[in-house]
């Protein structure tokens, strides 16, 4: 066989092979000649152009939270903010129980007495606002424990003074003094206190008067005197008539010019039943009611030798 014939036959075989793989089969269905149906399967067509993108589907369900990551580094400190406005003031709390005094300190002479101090004299106490104050403690009269805030004894100190002097206090520890209206208010503002007035005439006869619930108001209320009742005493009651009266001095006379007329600061109205801050006149005097007077005692024409006003916690 010649060479070109061999080549031709090989080419036909290859073409036939491609035709069998790429062209569809021919199938005949049916038994009889009239029932036979020829089915020709076509070749696959060329891939068409992609259609337009369809609409987005509905949002899927939220997935589970992932694992927490590693904390990052702390950032730098921010700038300090501006100070805010003060808040509203809260309601006042209920009054607490009295505190237990620290050994070696006291808030009044009664506490010193309870710690074993029995000798009268000047002692340091702590006021309710934490300040210290030197006071004369009477540890002998009627059981002791008294803070003495007024004393007349020899006429060495002038008691016809102005408002600020009575406010701050004045005098000498070894003779006559007034403890000060600010101090009186501070020491009597909380608690219940008993007031005692001790009087001694120039015959050295001593008498007294006692009162319950003594206190002095603050300066804005003109140091008004508060008392509840006369508790007794052979000097008689010459102070109940002054309760709820304002304090007056020669430069701030709150009632009827009494302080100017009777020469001393006191709780006046029109004008007085007593005035232990008047002139020191050595017993009997002809002038009217301007001495160290206690009307239910020796009257308006007798000036006492010694007077002391004192208070302590009420039993």
Curated annotation (Swiss-Prot):
Gene3D superfamilies on file: Gamma Fibrinogen, chain A, domain 1
Domain Fibrinogen C-terminal: 100-315
Renumbered residue ranges of the record's region Disordered: 75-99
Disulfide bonds: 109-137, 258-271
Signal peptide: 1-19
Keyword set, alphabetical order: Collagen, Disulfide bond, Glycoprotein, Immunity, Innate immunity, Lectin, Secreted, Signal
Any GO CC annotation of this UniProt entry: extracellular space
UniProt-listed InterPro entries: Collagen (IPR008160), Fibrinogen-like_C (IPR036056), Fibrinogen_a/b/g_C_1 (IPR014716), Fibrinogen_a/b/g_C_dom (IPR002181), Fibrinogen_C-term_domain (IPR050373), Fibrinogen_CS (IPR020837)
Job of this protein: May function in innate immunity through activation of the lectin complement pathway. Binds to GalNAc and GlcNAc carbohydrate moieties.
PANTHER family: FIBRINOGEN/TENASCIN/ANGIOPOEITIN, FICOLIN-1-A
Domain comment, as recorded: The fibrinogen C-terminal domain mediates binding to carbohydrates.
Protein name, entry field: Ficolin-1-A
Organismal lineage: Eukaryota, Metazoa, Chordata, Craniata, Vertebrata
């Amino acid at each position: 066989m010649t060479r070109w014939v061999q080549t031709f036959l090989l080419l036909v075989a290859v073409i036939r092979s491609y035709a069998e793989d790429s062209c569809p089969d021919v199938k005949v269905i049916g038994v009889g000649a009239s029932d036979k149906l020829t089915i020709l399967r076509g070749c696959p067509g060329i891939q068409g152009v992609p259609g337009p993108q369809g609409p987005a589907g509905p949002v899927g369900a939220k997935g589970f939270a992932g694992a927490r990551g590693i904390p990052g580094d702390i950032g730098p400190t921010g700038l300090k903010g501006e100070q805010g406005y003060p808040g509203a003031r809260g309601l006042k709390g209920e009054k607490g129980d009295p505190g237990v005094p620290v050994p070696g300190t006291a808030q009044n002479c009664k506490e010193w007495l309870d710690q074993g101090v029995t000798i009268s004299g000047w002692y340091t106490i702590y006021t309710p606002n934490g300040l210290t104050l030197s006071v004369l403690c009477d540890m002998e009269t009627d059981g002791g424990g008294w803070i003495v805030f007024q004393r007349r004894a020899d006429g060495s100190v002038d008691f016809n003074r102005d408002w600020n002097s009575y406010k701050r206090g004045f005098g000498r520890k070894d003779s006559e003094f007034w403890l000060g209206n600010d101090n009186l208010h501070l020491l009597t503002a909380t608690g219940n206190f008993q007031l005692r007035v001790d009087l001694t005439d120039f015959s050295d006869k001593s008498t007294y008067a006692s009162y319950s619930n003594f206190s002095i108001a603050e300066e804005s209320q003109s140091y008004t005197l508060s008392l509840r009742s006369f508790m007794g005493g052979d000097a008689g009651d010459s102070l109940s008539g002054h309760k709820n009266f304002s304090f007056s001095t020669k430069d701030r006379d709150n009632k009827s010019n009494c302080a100017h007329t009777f020469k001393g600061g006191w709780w006046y109205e029109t004008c007085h039943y007593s005035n232990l801050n008047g002139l020191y006149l050595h017993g009997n005097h002809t002038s009217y009611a301007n001495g160290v007077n206690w009307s239910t005692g020796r009257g308006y024409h007798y000036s006492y030798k010694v007077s002391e006003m004192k208070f302590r916690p009420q039993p």
